Design a protein with these regions (language model features):
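N-terminal "cap/leader" segments of large eukaryotic alpha-helical scaffolds
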Residues: 2-55, 69-70, 74, 815-817
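Flexible loop/turn segments at the boundaries of HEAT repeats in alpha-solenoid HEAT proteins
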Residues: 11, 15, 50-61, 95-104, ...
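Amphipathic alpha-helical segments within extended alpha-helical solenoids and repeat-rich scaffolds
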Residues: 15-21, 58-75, 100-120, 147-163, ...
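Structural signature of alpha-solenoid helical repeat scaffolds
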Residues: 33, 56, 75, 79, ...
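Long, compositionally biased acidic/polar linker segments
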Residues: 33-36, 40, 308-342, 346-425, ...
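HEAT-repeat alpha-solenoid elements in large eukaryotic scaffold proteins
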Residues: 34-52, 79-90, 121-135, 164-179, ...
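Helix-rich alpha-solenoid scaffolding regions
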Residues: 59-105, 382, 386-408, 412, ...
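A generic tandem-repeat structural signature
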Residues: 76-147
Length: 821
């Protein structure tokens, strides 16, 4: 035993000798090498302490403290951020691993450096303050008696740090660690002093670093002390955070959102906690105050409203509806910027995370109802197209990511899906007069949330298969295109999770489609209903290749025959009815293309003939002179539909594309380019009777055809690389691509565009032009935008340009992309 002790003591002594700083050697080095020497020494010291056992740390505490203070009091070189962080790690490791015999002495010595006169350099005080924060984070409960003195000294240093941004921010970071580390609420006067300084810094300081740490300091005061749970202080923190949340910097928005979320979550109370208040009713009867106007009582719910109360400040509580309304009211104000809305969306997420998993599971219906009905349907949101899309994205992130994936488990996910089906989808169309029909905005986000839950549950969703199938098929023919597409996507997720429902869903949708096609000549909304059923069928049929055991070749052949019959009989129909028949036929054919070469090969010759007929060689500009706007729109519409199915064919059947087939497809695409080149540049048509679709002009359809042509060209080149030279040399692909975004007259000038051009300073972004494509900018560039903003590719797990990537990056990206425009 004695030999072992001697060996351990020898190893300990040698380690101590290696950890000793040689100041003479340090100062003998050239000035440019002194920083590197000090950095290397402190890094080695961190590794040395991390490798020691608890008894070894206790044995070396005094020596290590001496070495650390030797570095803190160096006149040169300057203590950099990395060295400062290393010193803090050393102090934290010493008191978290070893005993705390020298803890009081260490805090006193660090306080002495903080309180030193002007003769002590600011960098030394900066390092001492940082080390104090690490000491309190590791062992603050053992020195809570000194917390008041430390807080007082740190607040005094704020005045001296007016010209040092990093020091100001670090002071608030240290104050936060002191408040958290002591383990008990700090003195109220000290807390009030921190509260005042942090509020002023959050709103008055221009540094984002200081603002972030000031907001985090406020958040910890709200979390660990009971002094600010009243109406007056809540109004103060709400005013501060809503002002800061409009910052262009995402970290500042997140810090302000977390602070406001902490305040709201701490003031949250269940009905059980608020209900038993008999005295408040009596006081309310005796009150002579006028009744509040509608909406004023929505701001807050106080437990006691008695004016005769002797307490100067009443305890404040929020029920869940009032708590959520605090956020939605501010979000829906017309003066709230999009950056502030993004911050409020992050605040929603923080509130739900703070309330806890169990609470969110129990109150999913109220939370989802607030977001889907109250927030999405507010006039301030629906009035502005970009604001609506942004809000839909925020609701998607909150409901699907924060709630659906983070909080809900399998049972609660099933309950949530049941609520979405019974509480929203089954109310369309309206059946009971007392239950309002959900708007298209509500239905869109509901279908998106349900699709996410179905994908997460997988085969466990079978318990809700029947009601879900009926609800989705009921929503599928909705008048809104957005709702129809989301319903089709949800049906795709549904049949993937419940493959035994595939054939029944396809059969029901196909029968409904045949019924609606027979009523195309009637005044009811049959065209939209037909396209809705076709999109649903296409989405469901495309899943057959993933689960072939549940499909049926007979059904596939029946659908293909139905599509070809529609193309053949469309020539006998009226123009608008024919356009619907053609669109439905090509959508169905596109849905069959994912079945792969085994099915498509049988019908390949017939498909090539159909595409050739739909994409013929154009006869020239003289031919257009005899056609009106309606007929030209029809020709563009036919080409866009045919190109859509051709694109899906190239995606899933590349093995069938031979060199001859590639040339034939390239010829069809070149024919379409010629058609686009000869289309006349017409202005917007106000006569609805001359439009193929009420909401689409001819130039809108032209843009859609251009998109499909470029997509098909791009896919063809990737599918058959040997045709690169032929495609580029024999077609005008490059001129089409360049003219799509470089041609000055590519956009058609209408009354709205002309008025905007005359007042260019009155709109914020290109989205306000309402030209449906923001002057050619497209979401297809999202990968480039993502790399530009975050510094990493989509599937890259390496470090990004930013050391800390936000957990709510989707919300930040939406605001960053808008600012880029």
């Amino acid at each position: 035993m004695s030999s072992t002790d001697t060996a351990a003591r020898t190893a300990s002594d040698s380690a101590a000798l290696r950890a000793e700083l040689d100041i003479t050697k340090l100062h003998a080095l050239p000035s440019e090498q002194q920083d590197l020497y000090l950095l290397t020494f402190t890094s080695d010291l961190v590794q040395h302490i991390s490798g020691l056992e608890k008894p070894q740390v206790s044995a070396q505490q005094k020596f290590l403290k001496k070495e650390l203070f030797k570095i803190l009091t160096l006149s040169s070189p300057t203590i950099t951020r990395v060295v400062r962080n290393n010193l803090g790690r050393c102090f934290g490791a010493i008191f978290s691993k070893g005993d705390r015999g020298i803890l009081f002495e260490t805090v006193t010595d660090l306080l002495g450096l903080l309180n030193a006169g002007k003769h002590e350099e600011l960098k030394t005080k900066f390092a001492a303050a940082h080390c104090l924060g690490e000491v309190f984070a590791a062992a603050g409960e053992s020195v809570f008696a000194q917390a008041g003195a430390v807080i007082s000294s740190l607040l005094k240093l704020l005045k001296n740090a007016s010209n040092h941004t990093g020091f100001r921010g670090s002071i608030f970071a240290v104050l936060r660690k002191v408040v958290v580390g002591v383990g008990i609420p700090v003195d109220e006067s000290a807390a009030r002093d921190i509260w005042k300084q942090a509020r002023n810094a959050a709103t008055g300081d221009k540094s984002t670093f200081v603002q972030v740490h000031a907001c985090r300091c406020l958040e910890q005061l709200l979390n660990t002390t009971p002094f600010f749970d009243n109406a007056n202080d809540f109004d103060h923190v709400k005013t501060v955070t809503l002002k800061v949340i409009d910052s262009p910097a995402a970290p500042v928005r997140h810090a302000a959102a977390a602070c406001l979320a902490r305040a709201l979550a701490k003031l949250h109370a269940t009905e059980a906690a608020v209900a038993p208040m008999p005295k408040s009713k009596k006081a309310k009867r005796q009150s002579k105050k006028p009744a509040p106007r509608p909406g004023e009582d929505e701001e807050e719910a106080e437990v006691s409203e008695s004016s005769a109360s002797k307490r100067p400040e009443s305890r404040l509580f929020f029920l869940l509806p009032d708590l959520l309304r605090q956020l939605s009211t501010q979000y829906s104000r017309s003066g709230t910027s999009n950056r502030a809305r993004a911050g409020i969306a992050v605040c929603y997420k923080h509130v739900l995370r703070t309330l806890g998993v169990k609470f969110v599971q129990e109150r999913y219906g109220e939370i989802a109802g607030h977001l889907l009905f109250d927030l999405l349907n507010h006039p301030a949101v629906t009035y502005n197209r970009f604001r609506l899309l942004m809000t839909r994205k925020f609701v998607k992130s909150i409901l699907e990511d924060t709630v659906g994936l983070e909080s809900l488990r399998e049972d609660s996910q099933l309950n949530a899906a049941r609520w979405l089906i019974n509480g929203v989808l089954k109310d369309y169309p309206q059946v009971i007069q007392e239950r309002r029909e959900p708007s298209k905005y509500t239905l869109t986000s509901t279908l998106s949330a349900l699709s996410s839950l179905i994908s997460s549950l997988g085969s466990a969703f079978t318990a809700l298969a029947e009601p879900c199938r009926d609800a989705l098929l009921q929503v599928l023919p909705h008048p809104s295109y957005t709702v129809r597409i989301h319903a089709a996507h949800c049906l795709r997720s549904f049949v993937l999770a419940c493959p035994h429902q595939l054939l029944s869903c396809v059969t029901i949708a196909l029968n409904s489609l045949n019924r609606e096609i027979g009523q195309l000549s009637t005044p009811r909304q049959a065209p939209r209903r037909c396209v809705g059923y076709a999109n649903g069928l296409s989405a469901m049929l495309s899943t057959s290749r993933l689960q072939p055991l549940y499909g049926s070749v007979e059904v596939y052949s029946r659908v293909f025959a139905q599509a070809t019959d529609l193309l053949k009989t469309s020539s006998n129909s009226e123009l608008r009815a024919a356009s619907t028949q053609i669109q439905v036929a090509w959508i169905l054919i596109g849905g069959l293309m994912p079945l792969g070469p085994s099915f498509v090969k049988i019908h390949l010759s017939q498909l090539m003939l159909l595409w050739k007929n739909a994409l013929p060689k154009h006869l020239g500009k003289e031919n257009f002179a005899q056609r009106g706007n309606l007929e030209m729109s029809f020709l563009a519409h036919v080409r866009e539909c045919a190109l859509g199915s051709l694109l899906v064919f190239l995606e899933f059947n590349s093995k069938l594309v031979t060199a001859d087939g590639a040339r034939r497809i390239a010829t069809m695409l070149q024919n379409t380019v010629g058609f686009l080149d000869d289309l006349p540049k017409q202005k917007s048509v106000t006569d609805i009777s001359q439009r193929l679709h009420p909401s689409l002009q001819l130039h809108d359809l032209t843009t859609m055809v251009q998109r499909r042509v470029l997509q098909c060209f791009s896919k063809l080149i990737h599918v058959h690389p040997l045709s690169h030279g032929d495609v580029i040399s024999q077609t005008s692909l490059l001129s089409l691509a360049i003219s799509s975004f470089a041609e000055p007259d590519s956009t058609q000038s209408g009354p709205l565009e002309s008025s905007i051009t005359a007042s260019t300073a009155q709109f914020e972004t290109l989205w306000d032009l309402s030209d449906n494509f923001a002057f050619g900018l497209t979401g297809l560039a999202r990968e480039y935008v993502h790399v530009t903003l975050s510094g990493r590719h989509q599937n890259d797990n390496g470090p990004a340009w930013s050391a800390v990537e936000s957990a709510d990056q989707a919300i930040d990206d939406s605001v960053s992309f808008e600012n880029a425009l």
